[in-house]
From Swiss-Prot:
SUPFAM superfamilies with a match to the protein in the record: GHMP Kinase, C-terminal domain, Ribosomal protein S5 domain 2-like
Top-level taxon of origin: Bacteria
Pathway(s): Amino-acid biosynthesis; L-threonine biosynthesis; L-threonine from L-aspartate: step 4/5
GO MF entry, a single one: homoserine kinase activity
Alphabetized NCBIfam families for the sequence: PRK01212.1-4, thrB
HAMAP family: Homoser_kinase (MF_00384)
A single GO BP: threonine biosynthetic process
GO cellular component terms listed in the entry, alphabetical order: cytoplasm
PANTHER family linked: HOMOSERINE KINASE, HOMOSERINE/4-DIPHOSPHOCYTIDYL-2-C-METHYL-D-ERYTHRITOL KINASE
Protein name as annotated: Homoserine kinase
Length: 307
């Protein structure tokens, strides 16, 4: 049996629309083995309303993409999915399925494709690199999907940096979130974001966290999506008052992320108490950065072959 462990991801990080992403220490596990015939997909009972267990399953679709690419098809498959990444919450659940499915398929066939080839397949399936890249390689990534390849850079983040995830109890699809965006943006808004992307990346990598309250600002996507996030203004205002260094909408939402530097317990507890007074359910959790990305797990533990 082949096992892969795929991290959650948070994308955009404010101004880095469709290009920046960070891997998080929250994981899905995918287990696959070849069987004599058919397709068997096993998922937890609580996920059965949201995840298909037939050929439309996204993990299987990713596996099939690789099988078709190399023209090798197993007789049958048993796929076990252990899902810890919340679905449709802006934490890269779809990217985890795509990345994990491609890698587990590659492993099943004794690795006919190189990592860069798999990354390209994943990015073409997802349409963007912002969640795909950190799921593969960990850390902070910036990338571009070109006609025949993906260009990217991975950067290590300071170990004291953590993310405070405020996860609503409702789904918000990427398709719906994209439908809220304008077809065109004013040049001054584009310049606003471009200037802050550079400041954001440099500040994160060099621990200049004092810049993050400004560097995470955005005029391209968050202004159009925030009205669909209950209590956005109240939550983000509270985040800054209690000591987070900056905040942003995670991916297309609805999760809101606060950036933490070091000690966080009082901030986490205060946020839980604050949110308990609203009529919208939220889960608050502190997540460490996943520095290594996806891992293939064998009987002796991780072999780390995709780092």
């Amino acid at each position: 049996m082949i096992r892969v462990k795929v991290p959650a991801t948070t994308a955009n990080i404010g101004p880095g629309f469709d290009s920046l992403g960070i891997a998080l220490q929250l994981y899905n596990i995918i287990e696959v083995e070849e069987i004599n015939f058919g397709l068997e997909i096993n998922i937890p009972v609580e996920d059965q309303a949201y995840i298909e267990t037939n050929e439309h399953n996204l993990v299987y679709q990713a596996m099939k993409r690789l099988f078709d690419a190399v023209n090798i098809h197993p007789k049958g498959l048993r796929i076990n999915l252990i899902n810890n990444i919340p679905i449709a919450r802006g934490l890269g659940s779809s990217a985890a399925c795509i990345v994990g499915g491609l890698v587990v398929a590659n492993e099943l066939l004794n690795n006919p494709l190189k990592k860069e080839e798999i990354i390209y397949l994943a990015a073409t399936m997802d349409g963007h690199t912002d969640n795909i890249l950190p799921a593969f390689v960990g850390g902070l990534t910036v990338g571009s999907l070109l006609e025949k390849e993906v260009k990217y850079v991975k950067m290590d983040l300071p170990t004291q940096l953590k993310l405070l995830a405020i996860i609503p109890d409702f789904h918000f699809s990427t398709k719906k979130a994209r439908s809220l965006l304008p077809k065109n943006v004013p040049i001054e808004d584009a310049v606003f974001n471009i200037s802050r992307v550079g400041l954001l990346v440099a500040s994160l990598v060099t621990s200049h966290f004092e810049n993050l309250s400004e560097a995470t600002k955005d005029k391209i996507h968050q202004p159009y999506r925030k009205d669909f996030i209950p209590y956005w203004e109240e939550i983000t205002s509270k985040l800054m008052k209690i000591g987070t260094k900056g905040y942003f909408l995670s991916g297309s939402g609805p999760t809101i992320m606060g950036i933490l530097d070091g000690d966080y317990k009082n901030i986490e507890d205060e946020m839980v108490n604050f949110l308990s007074h609203f009529d919208q359910g939220y889960k608050v959790t502190v997540l460490d950065v996943c520095h290594n990305g996806l891992e293939v797990i064998n009987d002796e533990g991780s072999n780390g072959c995709y780092r």
